[in-house]
Amino acid sequence: KLTAHKADQNGAPVYSYVFSWGTSYHTAEIPFVFNNIDKVSVSGDRDEAEKLSDIMSSAWINFAKTGNPNGDGIPDWEPYTRSNSAVMIFDNETYLVHNHEQELMSLLAPNYKY
């Protein structure tokens, strides 16, 4: 709901993501974003975790520098709009989906147009 609302404001582009690595919990993506997974215990394959950390930290660095997370080694990340509902999935594979979990979103906020 908040993502759609921010996209409607026509300010800076909005980039939405879901972190689905292993048994992820709230804030579990932080060590991946800052590329310091060696400082914490992470579930899953270590090589895959390092690969994901490289992708995520590159995207966040690109975004901090340019306002756009796209760059070498990162799947094309479209800004979120109501018409595309683009969401980047960060997991063993990193990929972009459109209209992610729309049925679930409709259940959570049935009167809101996503």
Residue locations for each model-derived region?
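C-terminal helix-and-tail extensions that cap enzymatic domains
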Residues: 1-114
